[in-house]
Design a protein with these regions (language model features):
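Alpha/beta-hydrolase-fold enzymes
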Residues: 116-188
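Glycine-rich nucleophile elbow surrounding the catalytic serine of serine-hydrolase chemistry
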Residues: 107-117
Length: 188
C-alpha cells in the first residue's frame, strides 16, 4: 500500500492509498468507505483484490481516518457534495495513471450513498459500480431526521458531535451484540 494526499474540494488534505498487484493489472477498483470507518479497515480486502489482478484505490473522507483535521471527526468541510467531488478527484488521479484499464467503484454503507450521488453527477465516469450495504428510508422519517439535525447543529455547532443525533442514528445498532465496549461495535 502506498499512501498519498490530495487537496480536498472542501479544503484540507485528503488521505489516500493505492494498492497495486504484483501481476499485470486488469482493472481499477476504487473503494468508498462507510460512516465511522477509514480505509485501513479495507486493507485485507484490497490485498485480496490485488491477488486477483486489481489495482485498488481509496481515500479517507474528510473527518475520517487520516483525513481528520484539528480533531474534528466525521465532519465534511464543504458538505456532502464536496465529499462526492473528492471521490471524483481520486478517480481522476488514478484513472490518469491507468488510462487503459476499466474503472470500477464500490461504495459501502454511507459510501454507497456517496456513490449513488457520484453516479448521478458523473454517469459516464465509471465502467461498473457496486452499491453495497445501502438503504432506503421513508421520506417522512428522512425529513424529520434532517429537521432534528438542523436543530442540533444550531444548538451544538456545525463541527460538534450531537449525542442526541448519535443515539437516534446508531443507538439500536449495538443491541444484537449484547455487552459491548465500543459504540461502533456494530461495524465489526
Amino acid at each position: 500500500m502506498k499512501e498519498f494526499y490530495l487537496d480536498s474540494c472542501g479544503g484540507g488534505r485528503l488521505h489516500c492509498a493505492i494498492w497495486t498487484p504484483e501481476s499485470e493489472p486488469k482493472a481499477v477498483v476504487q473503494l468508498i468507505h462507510g460512516i465511522a470507518e477509514h480505509i485501513g479497515r479495507y486493507d485485507d480486502f484490497a490485498r485480496f483484490l490485488n491477488a486477483h489482478g486489481y489495482v485498488v484505490a481509496a481515500d479517507d473522507h474528510m473527518g475520517h481516518g487520516g483525513s481528520v483535521e484539528n480533531g474534528v471527526k466525521g465532519y465534511f468541510s464543504g458538505g456532502w457534495l464536496s465529499a462526492v467531488e473528492d471521490e471524483k478527484r481520486l478517480h481522476d488521479e488514478i484513472a490518469a495513471q491507468y488510462p487503459a484499464l476499466p474503472y470500477y467503484i464500490l461504495g459501502h454503507s454511507m459510501g454507497s450513498f456517496l456513490l449513488r450521488t457520484y453516479l448521478y453527477t458523473y454517469p459516464d465516469a465509471v465502467d461498473k459500480a457496486v452499491i453495497s450495504g445501502t438503504g432506503w428510508e421513508d421520506p417522512t422519517k428522512v425529513r424529520l431526521g434532517k429537521l432534528v439535525c438542523r436543530l442540533e447543529q444550531a444548538r451544538v455547532g456545525e463541527t460538534s458531535t450531537s449525542k442526541l443525533v448519535t443515539k437516534l442514528m446508531y443507538g439500536s445498532y449495538n443491541k444484537s451484540f449484547g455487552a459491548v465496549t465500543s459504540p461502533n461495535a456494530w461495524i465489526c
